[in-house]
A protein has these predicted regions:
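DNA breakage-rejoining catalytic core of tyrosine-based enzymes
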Residues: 1-18, 69-80, 95-99
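Basic, Lys/Arg- and aromatic-enriched nucleic-acid-binding interface segment
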Residues: 2, 11-43
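Short, leucine-enriched amphipathic alpha-helices that occur as contiguous helical runs
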Residues: 18, 29-30, 120, 124, ...
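A short, glycine-centered helix-capping/turn motif at helix boundaries
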Residues: 25-26, 35-48, 155-159, 167-169
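Conserved tyrosine-mediated DNA breakage-rejoining catalytic core shared by Y-recombinases
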Residues: 39, 48-82
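Short, polar N-cap/turn motifs at the start of nucleic acid-interacting alpha helices
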Residues: 53-56, 157-173
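C-terminal catalytic core of Y-nucleophile DNA break-rejoin enzymes
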Residues: 68-88, 99-128
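Short basic/aromatic active-site micro-motif
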Residues: 137-155
Length: 173
C-alpha cells in the first residue's frame, strides 16, 4: 500500500486522478469522497456527520465542534450536485435526522443503518486500496482536503483567510 511509513504529506490529486478515483467507488464511498473534497473536511469530521447536519434548502453542511480538531463548529457550502447525491443516499437508506450519513454496515454487527458511524480506519483502508489499484501513490484520505484547499487558493484565488475559514484552521503554521 502507499504511504506505509505514514511520513510526509498526502498527495495533492490532479483532476484526472480525482475523477478516476471517484469512478472506482461504490455509492457510499463515492458520496463520502465528494463530501470530503468539497468541504475540505478531515476524515473524522465527515465520518461522524449526521443527517441533521445538512441544510438542503440553504446548501450548507454544518460540521459540529465535537468532531473537529479545533473544537469549533463551522458551516461549509456544498454544490447542488453533491447535495442531490446526499439526498439520494439518505433517502435510499431511509435515514432519519439523528442517523449517521456514513455508517458501518458490516455483516458482523447488529447495528441498524445509520446507528453507528463508519470508522475512519475503514475509510482510510478502503481509499488506500483504491488509490493503489488505480496507481496513485502517496494519496490518502487527507489528499481530498489538501487538493481542495490547493484548488481554492491557486485556481479560485481564495484568500488565506477564506481558506482558513472553510478548513477550520486557526493558523497556517
Amino acid at each position: 500500500m502507499c504511504k506505509t511509513n505514514r511520513s510526509g504529506k498526502s498527495a495533492v490529486l490532479t483532476q484526472e486522478q480525482l475523477e478516476l478515483f471517484l469512478g472506482q467507488l461504490p455509492e457510499k464511498y463515492s458520496v463520502l469522497a465528494e463530501v470530503m473534497y468539497f468541504t475540505a473536511g478531515r476524515v473524522k469530521e465527515i465520518c461522524t456527520l449526521k443527517v441533521r447536519s445538512i441544510n438542503f434548502q440553504d446548501g450548507l453542511l454544518t460540521i459540529e465542534k465535537a468532531s473537529t480538531k479545533t473544537k469549533e463548529t463551522r458551516q461549509v457550502p456544498l454544490p447542488r450536485t453533491v447535495l442531490e447525491h446526499l439526498r439520494s443516499w439518505i433517502h435510499s437508506k431511509e435515514l432519519g435526522p439523528d442517523d449517521y450519513i456514513f455508517y458501518t454496515d458490516s455483516k458482523n454487527t447488529s447495528y441498524r443503518p445509520g446507528e453507528k458511524a463508519i470508522s475512519t480506519q475503514s475509510v482510510d483502508q478502503f481509499f488506500r486500496k483504491t488509490f493503489d489499484w488505480i496507481g496513485v501513490t502517496g494519496a490518502s484520505t487527507h489528499s481530498f482536503r489538501r487538493t481542495r484547499l490547493t484548488y481554492l487558493h491557486l485556481v479560485e484565488k481564495w484568500s488565506l483567510a477564506e481558506i482558513m475559514d472553510i478548513s477550520g484552521h486557526k493558523n497556517l503554521l
